[in-house]
UniProtKB/Swiss-Prot annotation:
GO terms for cellular component: Cul3-RING ubiquitin ligase complex; cytoskeleton; cytosol. The keyword Phosphoprotein applies. Belongs to the KLHL3 family. Kelch repeats lie at residues 302-347, 348-394, 396-441, 442-490, 491-537, 539-585. This is Kelch-like protein 3. Phosphorylation at Ser-433 by PKA or PKC decreases the interaction with WNK1 and WNK4, leading to inhibit their degradation by the BCR(KLHL3) complex. Phosphorylated at Ser-433 by PKC in response to angiotensin II signaling, decreasing ability to promote degradation of WNK1 and WNK4, leading to activation of Na-Cl cotransporter SLC12A3/NCC. Phosphorylation at Ser-433 is increased by insulin. Dephosphorylated at Ser-433 by calcineurin PPP3CA, promoting degradation of WNK1 and WNK4. The gene is KLHL3. Residues 50-117 form the BTB domain. The keyword Nucleotide-binding does not apply. The modification Phosphothreonine is found at T295, T375. Substrate-specific adapter of a BCR (BTB-CUL3-RBX1) E3 ubiquitin ligase complex that acts as a regulator of ion transport in the distal nephron. The BCR(KLHL3) complex acts by mediating ubiquitination and degradation of WNK1 and WNK4, two activators of Na-Cl cotransporter SLC12A3/NCC in distal convoluted tubule cells of kidney, thereby regulating NaCl reabsorption. The BCR(KLHL3) complex also mediates ubiquitination and degradation of WNK3. Pfam families: BACK, BTB, Kelch_1. Pathway: Protein modification; protein ubiquitination. The modification Phosphoserine is found at S10, S376, S433.
Length: 587
């Protein structure tokens, strides 16, 4: 503040052999430069001692040459060189709009500038022109923080045009790491042929299956089919068809009209079919770009724990960082929600149905991890709490549950592409407090409570989306309602749960290949209504209750050692009936 005294720092220097007369003190006033620039800016605002006028469009800005030259190499070269501008009183700056130039000259005097979504694309090139490299870097940092599947390709193109090398690399890596979501957006569909080829040929492309790459090619061609059809073979050259399952090749790729009508594409399909006929040792001898597995850069993951009872329905959402063993609070749910189904799909976390403390609901909220915000989408057809939720073939399934008066056998599915819910075949048994999981293209509904027999269930049903039918598979060894169900290495785990008043710590695992259940090691604690997720080959069971209190602890199972281990750090809140999902950690 004006008139405020500033503490000076000083240093006394004494040379060896000198007497006291040769002592000297250097005094540093850290506020001096700031005060000086503040006064210069006040002089500028009063148009005092100004010796140059900078003009852009219809905006005229009075300034001091020495200040501009001190902060901008562009102005320094202009004012100290042999150009006519070195003596001119009025200088026009082209290729910069007046408002942006005014902001940048304000920055020269104040060291303050606001970068926003609205101004960053004009601010960065203007800062580059004036060689205000700190502002340019701030713009790059801002764009990097805004990377999202819907804009990363646009930011990549912008970075390329303006030679922002680091931002270009970051945006490209982001596009590769989030390809399944990126391919759904308008930016991807608007790419040029060479840009699509460059992206889908990358070894670093992060896809759970080569199916996504094939689907992306078909979508891009169909977007402007008339002009793009001729590029089909060039694109399919970069799809690693031999790495696709044989069933998918026969049922989907071979049936695609764009493949049927192109001889080169049919050759790629034949190559893939022949690859599947070879013994494994001979497959390894085939070396071409289409048989080489992709090697994506693994993104660190975080675990999201959504809502729950503590002891009433809550809005709180916690995020666990596996690398740092730390829990953080993130954006709360728009309203209280427990007993919901929670899944990760297409780059977002979905919280489906549940109980808000007074009513069973059919509403759905979606979390965007990049923006750290929740939004609402289309509601389900029925109210459901204690439902099961899972993702299969890009559809979100809401299975069973309780509508406030009765247990439900009905099942509905949601397409994020159309934002619509529709019913599929109901289960054979009403199931509330049901656990669900997806293994090898089938959806399983495990245990629960049917409300009619007043018994917890040991039965398990399997849904086949190809036939839209539910069938019973092998029963569990024990009745389990509120079991935590998860999938690890192609097997279905049922953890804890309860049978009447008895809360279990036992765990059993289902092998679809043999249609059998077997016991594995017990958990450290009895748990029902816990959240479950699989990360990096481990199965995590989160919270729940033990029959008397809600639990804040988390434990994980290692199938190699057949042991459960408690996480060293608990959640901030004990919660049961919370949903769990795993997402990529934001860059």
């Amino acid at each position: 503040m004006e008139g405020e005294s500033v503490k000076l720092s000083s240093q006394t220097l004494i040379q060896a052999g000198d007497d006291e007369k040769n002592q000297r003190t250097i005094t540093v006033n850290p506020a001096h430069m700031g005060k000086a620039f503040k006064v210069m800016n006040e002089l500028r605002s009063k148009q005092l001692l100004c010796d140059v006028m900078i003009v852009a469009e219809d905006v005229e800005i009075e300034a001091h040459r020495v200040v501009l030259a001190a902060c901008s190499p562009y102005f320094c070269a202009m004012f100290t060189g042999d150009m006519s501008e070195s003596k001119a009183k009025k200088i026009e700056i082209k290729d910069v709009d007046g408002q942006t130039l005014s902001k940048l000259i304000d920055y020269v005097y104040t060291a303050e500038i606001e970068v926003t979504e609205e101004n960053v694309q004009v601010l960065l090139p203007a800062a580059s022109l004036l060689q205000l490299m700190d502002v340019r870097q701030n713009c790059c940092d801002f764009l990097q923080s805004q990377l999202h599947p819907t804009n990363c390709l646009g930011i990549r193109a912008f970075a390329d045009v303006h030679t922002c090398t680091d931002l270009l690399q970051q945006a490209n890596a982001y596009a590769e790491q989030h390809f399944p979501e990126v391919m759904l957006g308008e930016e991807f569909l608007s790419l040029s042929l060479d840009q699509v080829c460059s992206l889908i040929s990358s070894d670093k492309l992060t896809v759970s299956s080569e199916e996504k790459v094939f689907e992306a090619v078909i979508s891009w061609i169909n977007y402007e089919k008339g002009t793009r059809l001729e590029h089909m073979a060039k694109l399919m050259e970069h799809v690693r068809l031999p790495l696709l399952p044989r069933d998918y090749l026969v049922q989907t790729v071979e049936e695609e009209a764009l493949i049927k009508n192109n001889n080169t594409c049919k050759d790629f399909l034949i190559e893939a079919m022949k690859y599947h006929l070879l013994p494994l040792d001979q497959r390894l001898l085939i070396k071409n770009p289409r048989t080489k597995p992709r090697t994506p850069v693994s993104l660190p993951k975080v675990m999201i724990v959504v809502g729950g009872q503590a002891p009433k329905a809550i809005r709180s959402v916690e995020c666990y960082d596996f690398e740092e063993d730390r829990w953080d609070q993130i954006a709360e749910l728009p309203s209280r929600r427990c007993r919901a189904g929670v899944v990760f799909m297409a780059g977002h976390v979905y919280a489906v149905g549940g109980f808000n403390g007074s009513l069973r609901v059919r509403t759905v909220d979606v979390y965007d991890g990049v923006k750290d915000q929740w939004t609402s989408i289309a509601s389900m057809q029925e109210r459901r709490s204690t439902l099961g939720a899972a993702v299969l073939n890009d559809l979100l399934y809401a299975v069973g549950g309780f509508d406030g008066s009765t247990g439900l056998a009905s099942v509905e599915a949601y397409s994020y592409k159309t934002n619509e819910w529709f019913f599929v075949a109901p289960m054979n048994t009403r199931r509330s407090s049901v656990g669900v999981g997806v293994v090898e293209g089938k959806l399983y509904a495990v245990g629960g409570y049917d409300g009619a027999s007043r018994q917890c269930l040991s039965t398990v049903e399997q849904y086949n989306p190809a036939t839209n039918e539910w069938i019973y598979v092998a029963d569990m060894s024990t009745r389990r309602s509120g079991a935590g169900v998860g999938v690890l290495s192609g097997q279905l785990y049922a953890t804890g749960g309860h049978d009447g008043p008895l809360v279990r710590k036992s765990v059993e695992v289902y092998d679809p290949g043999t249609n059998t259940w077997k016991q594995v090691a017990d958990m450290n604690m009895c748990r029902r209504n816990a959240g479950v997720c699989a990360v990096n080959g481990l199965l995590y069971v989160v919270g729940g209750d033990d029959g008397s209190c809600n639990l804040a602890s988390v434990e994980y199972y290692n199938p190699v050692t057949d042991k459960w281990t408690l996480l060293p750090t608990n959640m901030s809140t004990g919660r049961s009936y919370a949903g769990v999902a795993v997402i990529h950690k934001s860059l």
